[in-house]
Amino acid sequence: MDPNCSCAAGGSCTCAGSCKCKDCKCTSCKKSCCSCCPVGCAKCAQGCICKGASDKCSCCA
């Protein structure tokens, strides 16, 4: 179980503006949870809910 959610890892959960679910997929907003990208990365803002700042963001690869 993800300590911050009610779902099992890999399962589905709902998320608000800031994502606390690290191992779950957000279904209510149809976006995945990921680290925030550096300024200038448009991809991350479109497909993710930020859960924390990071210089390495898989959404932007």
UniProtKB/Swiss-Prot annotation:
Region named Beta: 1-29
GO annotation terms (biological process): cellular response to cadmium ion; cellular response to copper ion; cellular response to erythropoietin; cellular response to zinc ion; detoxification of copper ion; intracellular zinc ion homeostasis; negative regulation of growth
Cysteines engaged in disulfide bonds, as pairs: none
Binding site for a divalent metal cation 6: 37, 41, 44, 60
Pfam family, one: Metallothio
Entry keyword Repressor: no
MF terms in GO: metal ion binding; zinc ion binding
Residue ranges, annotated region (Alpha): 30-61
Annotated positions binding a divalent metal cation 1: 5, 7, 21, 24
Coiled-coil intervals: none
Chain residues that bind a divalent metal cation 5: 34, 36-37, 50
Superkingdom of source: Eukaryota
Residue sites binding a divalent metal cation 4 per the record: 33-34, 44, 48
Residues given in the record as a divalent metal cation 3 binding sites: 15, 19, 24, 29
Entry note about domains: Class I metallothioneins contain 2 metal-binding domains: four divalent ions are chelated within cluster A of the alpha domain and are coordinated via cysteinyl thiolate bridges to 11 cysteine ligands. Cluster B, the corresponding region within the beta domain, can ligate three divalent ions to 9 cysteines.
Function statement: Metallothioneins have a high content of cysteine residues that bind various heavy metals; these proteins are transcriptionally regulated by both heavy metals and glucocorticoids.
Quaternary structure and interacting proteins, as annotated: Interacts with EOLA1.
Family in the record: Belongs to the metallothionein superfamily. Type 1 family.
PANTHER family according to UniProt: METALLOTHIONEIN, METALLOTHIONEIN-2B
Protein name: Metallothionein-2A
